[in-house]
Amino acid sequence: MAKLILVFATLALFILLANASIYRTVVEFEEDDDVSNPQQGKCQREFMKHQQLRGCKQWIRKRAQQGRIGYEADDFELTLDVDLEDDENPMGPQQQSSLKMCCNELRQVDKMCVCPTLKKAAQQVRFQGMHGQQQVQHVFQTAKNLPNVCKIPTVGSCQFKASPY
């Protein structure tokens, strides 16, 4: 009986230590992210706040599947109303093109986070089925050009590389 109690006490101690160790590791990881690069944490929050740039991901995916990059002449009609605010736009938010949704999302993101959030969106599109090298290049090139397409002031085009993973 004493051996059984000793075994259970030892097992309980190991479980308690493992639980405390796991919790401490998670907390330290999150703190390290914010301390080493506070901008990265802020941009991650911006990305989540703006529904992970859903409209931008739709636009990027559509362009990559079509094998097109960025913005072309046939998109001119799509961008005519891009500058309209939601309340001025005759179409409801459900009917807006993914490009218009994307531009509206990007205008709401902090200027310092536009490129990091676009890179994150492009990475998610890439992970959701864009596997060919050409498709991956289209995904990241389209994402880089979106600030120009949406006429986001002071951003221009983003300078990031295609992520292999």
Curated annotation (Swiss-Prot):
Molecular-function annotations in GO: nutrient reservoir activity
Subunit-structure text: The mature protein consists of a small and a large chain linked by disulfide bonds.
Family: Belongs to the 2S seed storage albumins family.
Residues of the propeptide: 21-37, 71-89
Phylogenetic placement of the source organism: Eukaryota, Viridiplantae, Streptophyta, Embryophyta, Tracheophyta
Function of the protein: This is a 2S seed storage protein.
Signal peptide: 1-20
Listed Pfam families: Tryp_alpha_amyl
Entry-linked InterPro entries: Bifun_inhib/LTP/seed_sf, Bifunc_inhib/LTP/seed_store, Napin/2SS/CON
Protein name as catalogued: 2S seed storage protein 5
Any single GO BP term: pollen development
Keywords: Disulfide bond, Seed storage protein, Signal, Storage protein
Keyword Disulfide bond among UniProt keywords: yes
